[in-house]
């Protein structure tokens, strides 16, 4: 599956030591619905999710603008329908909109036909906002269905960012190759900042921002030393968008840049990986 430049041995642009992806999952109050059900969450949990569109998103967009970063936002279709103006702001700022389910449904075993209908519906919503074809996929709550890669290839996706099996980008081979940009629970702000009394299905935690900064900085340093890796942060405006946390993230961005990071969006990194492997890089050439 993994070829010479498809992971181990890849050289990043301009002599950079590592590819860093600051990705955002804009889930709003739908983050945990498919696990707990709306009725199981108290209003405080729902309103905490709404902090993303109400306040956290603006802080994230402002920080990205200050640092001149264009990145990727994974947006469920239902969130784009409810918070259309906010998603338009994301697209207007030059960020990529990528698939993240329609209703952020993370049930294992969703029938393939149902999931393909979800994809078609969400793609149409996001494409109407951005004017661009959706080429990126992240499964809700990282629940990638067994047929998921095959369905991405069928629908002409360029990349996936769900699996956690290594620290480099690699290719799902086939007639229409799909790049995997792996994530890791330790790079997810949910692991450190999600706090809920009502949600018994997950942990209750709230770490200091400085603790997370040091953990992510140490991870960055070690991955950068290996020179062919990616570091894919998975962030949520409702969590990282709190005032002290977004400042922590901006400090980390500055540190990474000073120490050899290529900070880019998922589509740009995926196209680079394909090009390094002599693969087709025009996902628009694949008919849906």
Model-derived regions: residue spans:
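Catalytic alpha-helical scaffold of carbohydrate-active enzymes acting on polysaccharides/glycoconjugates
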Residues: 1-136, 141-186, 212-233, 239-288
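Surface-exposed cleft-lining segments at the edges of enzyme active sites
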Residues: 134, 197-209, 237-238
């Amino acid at each position: 599956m993994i070829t010479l430049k498809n992971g181990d041995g890849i050289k990043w642009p301009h002599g950079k030591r590592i590819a860093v992806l600051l990705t955002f999952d804009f889930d709003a109050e739908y983050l945990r619905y498919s696990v707990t059900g709306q009725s199981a969450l108290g209003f405080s949990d729902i309103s905490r999710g709404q902090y993303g569109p109400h306040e956290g998103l603006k802080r994230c967009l402002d920080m990205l603008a200050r640092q001149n970063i264009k990145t990727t936002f994974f947006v469920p279709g239902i969130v784009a329908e409810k918070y259309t103006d906010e998603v338009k702001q994301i697209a207007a700022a030059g960020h990529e909109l990528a698939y993240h389910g329609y209703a952020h449904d993370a049930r294992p075993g969703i029938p393939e036909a149902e999931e393909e209908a979800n994809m078609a519906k969400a793609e149409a919503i996001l494409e109407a906002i951005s004017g661009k074809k959706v080429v990126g996929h992240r499964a809700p709550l990282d629940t990638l269905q067994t047929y998921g890669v095959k369905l991405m290839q069928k629908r002409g996706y360029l990349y996936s960012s769900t699996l956690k099996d290594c620290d480099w980008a690699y290719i799902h081979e086939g007639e229409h190759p799909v790049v995997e940009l792996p994530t890791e629970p330790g790079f997810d702000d949910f692991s450190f900042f999600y706090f809920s009394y009502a949600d018994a299905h997950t942990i209750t935690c709230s770490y200091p921002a400085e603790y997370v900064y040091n953990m992510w900085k140490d991870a960055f340093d070690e991955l950068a030393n290996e020179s062919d890796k990616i570091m894919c942060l998975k962030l949520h405006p409702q969590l990282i968008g709190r005032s002290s946390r977004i400042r922590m993230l901006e400090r980390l961005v500055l540190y990474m840049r000073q120490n050899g990071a290529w900070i880019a969006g998922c589509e740009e990194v995926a196209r680079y990986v394909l090009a390094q492997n002599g693969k087709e890089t025009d996902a628009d050439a694949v008919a849906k």
